[in-house]
């Protein structure tokens, strides 16, 4: 009998539901919230209200597109955390109610685990390259920057992580400093493609081991821009493409420097990226180039699976379900999760 898993993702500002059958994606529906752009960031209260409005129609549409009924489901995978508590509570509560009504098990998923396993999302009639275990994953998003050793679909070891800000936050803060809007990552990426990445240079951290730090590079940009505007009020408008290209290159240099070191120390040549920042064109180009240079096997998730989506939650939940993992109904969402 086929395992049919419903995945539910509601950790931030996207309500998503997906259905997989024996590891093959049948549907992936996402309802994004546009209201936050007016505030320059996600407003938790508005996000949770939107999830409440979206969760039922999104799940219904995912089931319809998959061609299955709720009674056909084997289990429900849902994001427990990390994320915004109000948003997570909507998805968790819905998963509990559906689990009770259908008398089927729940499987909680760490949101980051979903990003790590995004390369395993299989689609009908679409060729897919899957990394072999163990592999390294550069996990980069608005809330996390980590190098993870993935031993199996359910076993992970964090080799390094940010000690302050995440790289996605650095992109957003840069965009705000330059008056470019939110979310900053895609805006900076687009402008960077028109700029000169060697034009400006910003401070890079000297952090031991495999950990990251991005607070210093943000401060370096802030002071540099402030000083230049004092000399020329039109500095930003004249140089925004070069500023974006140079700042983006600095962040990518920092990310890949530690990833290269991790690959050397572990002697692992299977390398992936995941998380929202893995959609960045500069990062994708550089990691592929490093892969060729260093004889890595590199794997890049499809861009549509880099941002928050339930397909990755469903595939992570499927792996856990096969491993015998079940989640009790008294589970509560958490904004932070200590480990995987």
What are the roles of these predicted feature ranges?
Residues 1-2, 109-135, 316:
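Conserved phosphate-binding catalytic cores of ATP/NTP-utilizing and phosphoryl-transfer enzymes
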Residues 2-82, 111, 243:
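N-terminal beta-alpha supersecondary unit
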Residues 15-20, 137-139, 145-149:
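Short beta-strand scaffold segments in enzyme catalytic cores
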Residues 69, 190-271, 281-294, 321-324, ...:
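A contiguous, well-structured pocket-lining segment that forms one wall/lid of small-molecule binding clefts
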Residues 78-103, 121-122, 281-290:
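Short Gly/Thr/Asp-enriched flexible loops that form oxyanion-binding sites at enzyme active sites
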Residues 108-109, 288-313:
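Conserved phosphate-binding/catalytic loops in two-lobed NTP-binding clefts
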Residues 113, 151-194, 218-219, 223-227:
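Glycine-rich phosphate-binding loop plus the immediately following alpha-helix
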Residues 115-117, 301-340:
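Glycine-rich phosphate-binding/hydrolytic loop that grips phosphoryl groups
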